Swiss-Prot record:
Name listed for the protein in its UniProt record: DNA-directed RNA polymerase subunit 7-like protein
Keyword match Mitochondrion: no
Name of the encoding gene: NRPB7L
UniProt-annotated location(s): Nucleus
Matches recorded under SUPFAM superfamilies: Nucleic acid-binding proteins (SSF50249)
Keyword entries, A-Z: DNA-directed RNA polymerase, Nucleus, Transcription
Family annotation (SMART domains): S1
Length: 200
């Protein structure tokens, strides 16, 4: 689900990057970089964008020594802001583009969600079609009515399970989703071509 949440965190920047200018722009740039590198958190999901900068507190004046033993002044500012987020949850209905087809399932990408796995066991009435290498058609899943799930096809699916993976130092955290087409006649391929990045 999509949300707009208020968040607070400390943003650290090197004093030499200020060059006598207002700290607001460097702080905002650093905050954006941190969110891009972190990508997602367990509580709120994927960070989609900062919608408002609420406040920037006073510098906490931390000093550290760098590797060359020259003292580098690190300024740390408490920042409050609102952020648009996307948290996938069991039962959500999403749509995304098929990126890879294997004999036992397909990987779907939906906006920032790169790893939605749709198992053949969760595709009622579909069967795997392995095309010979000499043919132009790629491997895909197909029903008796000839509807296909193949690379590039946009698929509507329901979230069956969600797993959050937090990486060391919170760099490029990610969500992994199990998808299903069971339980609703509207689930399945909705077009043969579509946006690689559905509107978020």
């Amino acid at each position: 689900m999509f949300s707009e949440v208020e968040m607070a965190r400390d943003v650290a920047i090197c004093a030499k990057h200020l060059n006598g200018q207002s700290p607001h722009q460097p702080i905002l740039c650093r905050l954006l970089q941190d969110l891009i590198h972190e990508k997602a958190c367990r509580e709120h999901g994927f960070y989609l964008g900062i919608t408002a900068l609420k406040s920037i507190g006073n510098n906490k004046n931390n000093n550290i020594d760098n590797e060359n033993n020259h003292q580098a002044k690190i300024l740390t500012f408490p920042v409050s802001f609102t952020c648009r987020t996307f948290l996938p949850a069991r039962g959500d209905i999403l749509q995304g583009t098929v990126k890879k087809v294997l004999w036992n399932g397909a990987f779907i990408r939906s906006g920032p969600l790169r790893y939605a796995y749709l198992s053949l066991l969760k595709m009622p009435h579909y069967h795997y079609v392995h095309s010979p290498l000499s043919e132009d058609e790629k491997p895909h899943f197909q029903k008796d009515d000839l509807s296909k799930i193949a690379v590039g096809v946009v698929v509507r699916f329901q979230v069956l399970a969600v797993r959050f993976k937090e990486r060391p130092h919170k760099r490029r955290n990610d969500y992994y989703v199990l998808a299903t087409l069971e339980g609703n006649g509207s689930f399945g391929p909705i077009s043969l071509t579509g946006s690689d990045e559905p509107y978020m």
